[in-house]
């Protein structure tokens, strides 16, 4: 017969649970656990982390804290992968940057301590002399910019406008400090030889445009002729009977204001008998307008970025062409010069030709130089009494006010226009000097400047007109510190150097990274159309070889 067996009850007078571990469970490891815990968690995010160690174990739970029941996967070679842990190489200007900075700071501190120690040991008169020497040294460094800035960004070397070949010989070298000292006063009054073309009248409604009444810039499809000197039929005709130096206003303005230039440029010089012709290369970037060229930190974007120097130059040229035509009364009455435009064919529509007039002028530079220049006007303007004034129309464009220490035109143009023009003079000194020289050579009464900005900072295809400003070329030249005597002195110096050369073709090249211009002698056939075709064929062959 079954009977009830009373179990053994362990009495624990001091707490709960059994008093001792049974024999069968004595050597078995134990870990506090919860039925809600997963076995072998990849990462345990349940444990709270406390910054203060006083609360590390006070509110934490022991459940899930051990790894006795965790599942570990055995080594599986199929899931093995190589990981590239090589350190990326730093660029040259970043390498040891902080170490050099600390070294420079430590050196400056030691130098100051040494100066202070020397001052303490010197007598009173010697102290005054030492302080005066230090003051003059700081003044010199401030004036001439001999200050070492360890955090200053390194400027990358700029490319030359044309590749200098090994068979080119340097005939002359002129540095900018030398050219800035040139002066020439024996310049005769200009004489008009021939005037060609037709001009449209300026629309004075553009003078009333403000930042609050901005006007969109329209794309106007008109033909602009940028004919070089030797391709000009009028200059060819005049060269048979008069003159011994021939050029265009853009080429002469480049030479006359060259001491302000930063980027590389080049001009072809042809010595034919006793005559001198200044030309530009075909398919060159000579006519592109630079942007922020003379800024402390000019744009340095590369590739297809719309803020790269070349794309900014193309954008500025596009804006300048469109604004110079949009601000005129297009399709209405024109001011006609005695002779027609020499570059327009008979079957071309006159409305498709840009408003431009050419004035061929003659200067006497001493007794031996007879200079003939083709100058340009962009428009004509009538005064209060009906008098006619010829004007040159140019455009300043804002691409991003956050760069080159710029100011926001939409905020400052109406109230602080002086600050805007001062900033532009600092960032585009060379371009403004070229425009001023062109206006002075052409004899224009006024120089019209348009202020055009992007519709959006990151959109280089749409622009708006924010305002205009008018200057007299002579007054503007003095305002931007452009010395006319120095400009003529530089030109006379270049002409004298080229006149001493033998017959042939030469190249005036601005060094891309130095304040120097050099005169190279070129072999026969350089920059000819046949040579350009051969270069293009070689480039195509190289591209085909790379593709294959």
UniProtKB/Swiss-Prot annotation:
**Keyword RNA-binding on entry:** yes
Q: Which GO terms describe its cellular component?
A: eukaryotic 43S preinitiation complex; eukaryotic 48S preinitiation complex; eukaryotic translation initiation factor 3 complex; eukaryotic translation initiation factor 3 complex, eIF3m; synapse
A GO BP annotation: translational initiation
- UniProt region (RNA gate), positions on chain: 285-299
| Annotated region (Disordered), positions in chain | 523-548
- Where does this one sit in the cell? Cytoplasm
Q: Where does the record place the modification N6-acetyllysine?
A: 53
Report the main location listed first in the record.
Answer: cytoplasm
List keywords of the entry alphabetically.
Answer: Acetylation, Cytoplasm, Initiation factor, Phosphoprotein, Protein biosynthesis, RNA-binding
Read off the PANTHER family from this record. Answer: EUKARYOTIC TRANSLATION INITIATION FACTOR 3 SUBUNIT 7 (PTHR12399), EUKARYOTIC TRANSLATION INITIATION FACTOR 3 SUBUNIT D (PTHR12399:SF0)
Q: Which protein family is named in the record?
A: Belongs to the eIF-3 subunit D family.
Summarize the protein's role: mRNA cap-binding component of the eukaryotic translation initiation factor 3 (eIF-3) complex, a complex required for several steps in the initiation of protein synthesis of a specialized repertoire of mRNAs. The eIF-3 complex associates with the 40S ribosome and facilitates the recruitment of eIF-1, eIF-1A, eIF-2:GTP:methionyl-tRNAi and eIF-5 to form the 43S pre-initiation complex (43S PIC). The eIF-3 complex stimulates mRNA recruitment to the 43S PIC and scanning of the mRNA for AUG recognition.
- Partners and quaternary state? Component of the eukaryotic translation initiation factor 3 (eIF-3) complex, which is composed of 13 subunits: EIF3A, EIF3B, EIF3C, EIF3D, EIF3E, EIF3F, EIF3G, EIF3H, EIF3I, EIF3J, EIF3K, EIF3L and EIF3M. The eIF-3 complex appears to include 3 stable modules: module A is composed of EIF3A, EIF3B, EIF3G and EIF3I; module B is composed of EIF3F, EIF3H, and EIF3M; and module C is composed of EIF3C, EIF3D, EIF3E, EIF3K and EIF3L. EIF3C of module C binds EIF3B of module A and EIF3H of module B, thereby linking the three modules. EIF3J is a labile subunit that binds to the eIF-3 complex via EIF3B.
**What is the name of this protein?**
Eukaryotic translation initiation factor 3 subunit D
Q: Which gene does this sequence derive from?
A: Eif3d
């Amino acid at each position: 017969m079954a009977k009830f067996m009373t179990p053994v009850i362990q009495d624990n007078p001091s707490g709960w649970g059994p008093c001792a571990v049974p024999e069968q469970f004595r050597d078995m490891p134990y870990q506090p656990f919860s039925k809600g815990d997963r076995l072998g968690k990849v990462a345990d995010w349940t444990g709270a982390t406390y910054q203060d160690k006083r609360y590390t174990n006070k509110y934490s739970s022991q459940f899930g804290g051990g790894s006795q029941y965790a599942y570990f996967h055995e080594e599986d070679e199929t899931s093995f992968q190589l990981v590239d842990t090589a350190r990326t190489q730093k660029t040259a200007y970043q390498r040891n940057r902080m170490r050099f900075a600390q070294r420079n700071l430590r050196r400056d501190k030691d130098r100051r301590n040494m100066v202070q120690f020397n001052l303490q040991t010197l007598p009173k008169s010697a102290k005054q002399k030492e302080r005066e020497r230090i003051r003059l040294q700081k003044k010199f460094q401030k004036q001439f910019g001999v200050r070492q800035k360890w955090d200053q960004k390194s400027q990358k070397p700029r490319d030359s406008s044309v590749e200098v070949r090994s068979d080119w010989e340097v005939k002359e070298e002129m540095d900018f400090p030398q050219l800035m000292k040139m002066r020439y006063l024996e310049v005769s009054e200009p004489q008009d030889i021939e005037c060609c073309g037709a001009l449209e009248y300026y629309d004075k409604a553009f003078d009333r445009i403000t930042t609050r009444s901005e006007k969109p810039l329209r794309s106007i499809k008109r033909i602009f002729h940028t004919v070089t000197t030797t391709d000009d039929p009028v200059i060819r005709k005049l060269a048979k009977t008069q003159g011994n130096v021939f050029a265009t206003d853009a080429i002469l303005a480049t030479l006359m204001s060259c001491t302000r230039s930063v980027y590389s440029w080049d001009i072809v010089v042809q010595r034919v008998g006793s005559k001198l012709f200044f030309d530009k290369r075909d398919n060159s970037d000579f006519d592109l307008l630079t942007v922020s060229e003379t800024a402390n930190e000019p744009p340095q974007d590369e590739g297809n970025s719309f803020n790269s120097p070349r794309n900014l130059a193309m954008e500025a040229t596009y804006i300048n062409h469109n604004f110079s035509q949009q601000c005129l009364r297009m399709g209405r009455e024109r001011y006609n010069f005695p002779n027609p435009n020499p570059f327009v064919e008979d079957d071309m529509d006159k409305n498709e030709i840009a408003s431009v007039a050419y004035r061929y002028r003659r200067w006497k530079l001493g007794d031996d130089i007879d200079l003939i220049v083709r100058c340009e006007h962009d428009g004509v303007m009538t005064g209060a009494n009906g008098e006619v004034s010829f004007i040159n129309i140019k455009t300043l464009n804002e691409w991003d006010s956050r760069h080159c220490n710029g100011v926001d035109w939409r905020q400052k143009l109406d109230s602080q226009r002086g600050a805007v023009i001062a900033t532009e003079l600092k960032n585009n000194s060379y371009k403004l000097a070229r425009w001023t020289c062109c206006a002075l050579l052409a004899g224009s009464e006024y120089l019209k400047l348009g202020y055009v900005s992007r519709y959006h900072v990151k959109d280089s295809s749409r622009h708006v007109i924010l305002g205009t400003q008018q200057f007299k070329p002579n007054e503007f030249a003095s305002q931007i510190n452009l010395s006319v005597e120095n400009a003529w002195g530089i030109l006379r110096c270049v002409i004298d150097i080229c006149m001493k050369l033998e017959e042939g073709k030469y190249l005036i090249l601005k060094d891309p990274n130095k304040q120097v211009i050099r005169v190279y002698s070129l072999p026969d056939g350089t920059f000819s159309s046949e040579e350009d075709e051969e270069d293009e064929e070689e480039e195509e062959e190289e591209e085909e070889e790379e593709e294959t």
